């Protein structure tokens, strides 16, 4: 319980002097401030006035901040001398409902903070509530009276304790369930040999170790249906050696058939895998396109198309199916660049609606030295219809450096591949 949260009006023993009441909120004021003209009110009311008008509610003098006010020490001192009932004497402080079995002390407002620290009826949060989570589904403890706090901690269902068998930390409320159903160190009695075995080793004991457990004959799949104690299995095999020889032949024949079947299935899987690889290659091809754009009379194109003007390429399809509407593209080439500082700009333009991630490259051919070809690779997430990506080249391209052929031709190789389609999203409001 915070002192600042307490409304003292109903705690005061006897009548309250009107001078102690805040003229704005009409509650008993404990933290008292006043303006330069001496008009006083509680701190909370002054803070509200500063926020709204920055002036005193009585004389209208300017108040810049709470720090510009002074405290009324005399009035505060008188108020703090008032006798009050301990807040813990109420079962419902808000509605002033007294609890006859709670604290009966009467103290001053000044001594309240010290009293609450020691009052055995003060409610405290259980520190073990931090151990409650979705995994253990423990319920948090209710607030506890300070006088009962030590006793509660000794028995708190959410306190952590160590398992007496495995030393794992668990909450007290889960102790019984842990020991009865989960603890790996708890001893269980084997129903075959009657030995006590740790729960963590119990299944392994019965499956591989226990000499008294009845197990199937190793030649069960060959036809022997006997159940024999693990300790007697050698004797069983020795006494019935002839029969077990026949059983072993049966098992070998059965295994041979299984092996033939497995080989057949393996061959089918290999064939199917090859088919899938072939289909995948075809599918990959169907989403990619490689082309060569030959632009003749390049010097004329440089004069004809100014900055920001483009040459349009024909429409092309990355799919092998001409009817596919989801794989058409075109190119735009700006011989003098689209903006200042560019020499050549190339736009890849998507002519279908679906958002797609696309890989593409442009390579300007060098007619003198093919190893000097200039290539730019890109990947881009294209949006709706007619979305485009601009690839920019900054070099000078002329006959001297080999990028323009002797017959005045520029050659651009390009490749476009659709990596992924994205579904359309439709929203109805």
UniProtKB/Swiss-Prot annotation:
Location(s) in or outside the cell: Cytoplasm
InterPro entries hit by this protein: Znf_RING/FYVE/PHD, Znf_TRAF
Zinc finger RING-type: from-to: 22-60
Chief place where the protein resides: cytoplasm
GO CC terms, sorted: cytoplasm
TRAF-type ZnF: 151-203, 204-265
Cysteines joined through disulfide linkages: none
Role: Probable adapter protein and signal transducer that links members of the tumor necrosis factor receptor family to different signaling pathways by association with the receptor cytoplasmic domain and kinases.
PANTHER family assigned: RING-TYPE DOMAIN-CONTAINING PROTEIN-RELATED (PTHR10131:SF156), TNF RECEPTOR ASSOCIATED FACTOR (PTHR10131)
Entry's free-text remark on domains: The MATH/TRAF domain binds to receptor cytoplasmic domains.
Name of the protein in question: TNF receptor-associated factor family protein DDB_G0267744
Organism name: Dictyostelium discoideum (Social amoeba)
